Amino acid sequence: QRHRLSSGAGLKKPVSVLVLIHTPGLEVLLLERAAHPGFWQSVTGSQESDEQLAQTAVREVAEETGISAGPRDLVDWHLTNRYEIFPEWRHRYPPAVTENVEHVFSLLMPARVTVSVSPGEHRGYVWLPWQEAARAVFSWSNRDAILMLPHRLRSD
């Protein structure tokens, strides 16, 4: 597994990124979780101790897809989502931490690209039209971000 845990007794920081990777035609890249077949999502991951959020997004995109992007390639939506960490995952975080704060970014690709998924984390990928992608994802925050994508693209 290519996940690295943040410093501080090996516990994760309750701050993460969600990165929507999409084409100009609003096709959205989704990854299928290895441990949960049928669980589709965009790129996600936890911030490491000394990283800026854009660095976290760049690192997670590279780790989960093999796509090389720089901080300037990303669009920071200045949008955060706060959600409860499922009880079965709380042992990964400091004691008494029950919520995560997720920061949303997007990455525009000129066209669909071949993706190299991290086998320990994901079992496959698909490019879907944004409406289908919104229906396919498990997470409400991922769904809501995908549903905002057409408006975000028009306003950028």
Where do the model's predicted regions map?
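Short, acidic/hydrophobic/Gly-rich beta-strand patch recurrent on exposed beta strands
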Residues: 30-33
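Unchanged
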Residues: 47-141
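A conserved beta-turn-beta hairpin within the catalytic core of GNAT-like acetyltransferases
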Residues: 36-39
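Charged phosphate-binding loop/patch that engages nucleotide di/tri-phosphates or the phosphate backbone
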Residues: 135-156
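Short, P/G- and charge-enriched loop/turn segments at secondary-structure junctions
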Residues: 2-11, 88-96
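A short gly/proline-enriched turn/hairpin at secondary-structure junctions
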Residues: 41-44
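Conserved N-terminal beta-strand and adjoining loop/helix that marks the start
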Residues: 3-28, 46-49
